[in-house]
Amino acid sequence: MATLKINDLHVQVEGKEILKGVSFSMSEGETVALLGPNGHGKSTLFNAIMGHPRYKITKGSIYLDDVDLTHMTTDERARAGLFLGLQNPAEVPGVINSDFLRAAVNATSEERVSTYKFYKLLDSATKELKMPFDLATRSLNEGFSGGEKKRNEILQLMLLNPKIAMLDEIDSGLDVDAIQTVADVINKLEGEGKGFLVISHYARLFDLIKPTRAIVMVNGKIVLDGDPSLIKRIDQTGYEFIKAELGINIEKEENKMNEVSIGSCAVRESIKK
């Protein structure tokens, strides 16, 4: 069973320290909710774990089992078994979705997947996600609705078959039925032993996927790591109790960094704007 271990992680973006000593671990078969106010380091943590070059690790380490990922490239981390479902998937005109997905699958597979096998997998996955198959013939995310983009991220997840998946607000832009469909897929994959680290600001998704644990980030640090009851408490009362009970002042949200993410982490080097 694969275990992701983050130890004393410090991360800077454009010279500003965002993460200030983050440590935690999680394993396959576990679903962890990552909570916290906007602008307090959750997405930065995901990008740093995945190896986005704009996020500079100044201290600490990232391990998947006994493999040190800290200085690996994004595509190397994807091959090791990590996946990041993006909050704002970019549109890439001229790159056909199915070609992109097949390149991503082959980039992370030990053996090259034949065209026949790939399209068989693609057909099965799109049906499970209740996606129209013609999305596969269009340019990557171009003209996709917000919900279609998010389903396309889950489609990548299903095809790439990682050990640990990080999902950044995967439920935003989805209607009630689509959230249920995505939750069903997450629950199925968790049952097969996949690990999930999930950011969401809505309790509905967590009600459906039932995390085993909840982590709260404030001011670039983990301030709470406990059971799922934290999710309900925060949904009902917000984050004010953190100041009252832990004596931690919640800094105001600053302007978010503009993130540029192109497609799947598995083929980051293959596609240039």
Sequence positions of predicted segments:
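Walker B catalytic motif
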Residues: 169-170
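Conserved hydrophobic segment flanking the Walker A/P-loop of ABC-type ATPase nucleotide-binding domains
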Residues: 26-28
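ABC ATPase NBD Q-loop/coupling interface
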Residues: 61-77, 141
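Helix-to-loop junction immediately C-terminal to a conserved catalytic motif
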Residues: 50
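ABC-family P-loop ATPase nucleotide-binding domains
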Residues: 90-163
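Conserved structural motif at the start of ABC-family nucleotide-binding domains
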Residues: 4-6, 19-21
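Conserved beta-strand-loop-alpha-helix hinge in the C-terminal portion
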Residues: 217, 221-244
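The feature captures the beta-strand-to-loop junction immediately N-terminal to the Walker
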Residues: 35-37
